[in-house]
Regions:
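Surface-exposed, low-complexity/disordered segments
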Residues: 1-231
Length: 231
């Protein structure tokens, strides 16, 4: 703990072992570092998770996990990044707005052209997509699912009609997105709102696919997370 800076830093010498019974995964998380800034209430943790599917005892348990994973996926940042890559934001239930600040007053501006406003560029040589939003902050609204009651209980000012997350980008820095939803450099964006609240409990591997609908193989990658408490 750094008293002058009011900063807590945690390092791990061994991978963290996480058992997620709700989603049916064991996660070996190699934590690089965890930092919490008490002045800003901003948390940053970076690391690399290795997911292993738990062995189900019966078909009912398998179906329960599949249903829970689908709920965790829909509206998640993984879902969002895949939707950006495939230019399917509207079809997936996402809406994007720019957040503009003037004299400490925030204004949300609806967008007509999501991809033009994010300066969407597809690099066919690497099968990646680059985005660099015109505004530093974007609001991501997921309209197909309402927020958890647990989230609403701790965020009284949040809307109960949709899930709202805020993503802050570094100026003049592109974010690269792969087909499986992996994006980099992950340290270059900060996440607030609903996605920050979900965190590891709802984290899915990059090769996740809905077994009832998916037909293609998705590449696996690692991740780091830059997250802040809900706004």
């Amino acid at each position: 703990y750094y008293r002058r800076a009011k900063r807590l830093k945690i390092l791990a010498t061994e991978p963290l072992e996480i058992v997620n019974d709700a989603l049916g995964y064991t996660i070996k998380y190699e934590l690089d570092s965890f930092i919490h800034e008490y002045n800003t209430q901003l948390s940053l943790y970076t690391g690399f998770p290795l997911f292993r599917e738990m062995q189900s005892n019966n078909m009912a348990e398998t179906e329960k996990w599949d249903a829970a994973r689908k709920v965790a996926y829909e509206g998640s940042i993984l879902h969002f990044m895949r939707s950006v890559f495939h230019k399917k934001l509207n079809e997936a239930g996402f809406e994007i707005q720019f957040i503009v600040k003037n004299n400490n007053i925030e204004t949300a501006i609806p967008l007509k052209d999501y991809y033009g406003s994010m300066r969407f560029y597809r690099d066919d040589s690497s099968n990646t997509v680059e985005i660099m939003p015109i505004q530093k902050e974007i609001a991501v609204i997921y309209k197909n699912e309402t927020p958890s009651t647990l989230f609403l209980d701790s965020n009284r000012d949040a809307s109960a009609a949709f899930q709202l997350s805020v993503v802050s980008f570094l100026p003049n820095e592109t974010l690269d997105i792969e087909q499986n939803g992996f994006y980099f450099e992950q340290k270059d964006i900060t996440i607030n709102g609903y996605w920050a609240w979900e965190k590891i409990a709802d984290m899915l591997p990059y090769d996740y696919k809905d077994r009832s609908t998916a037909t293609e193989t998705i590449e696996v990658n690692t991740t780091s997370v830059n997250a802040a408490p809900p706004v």
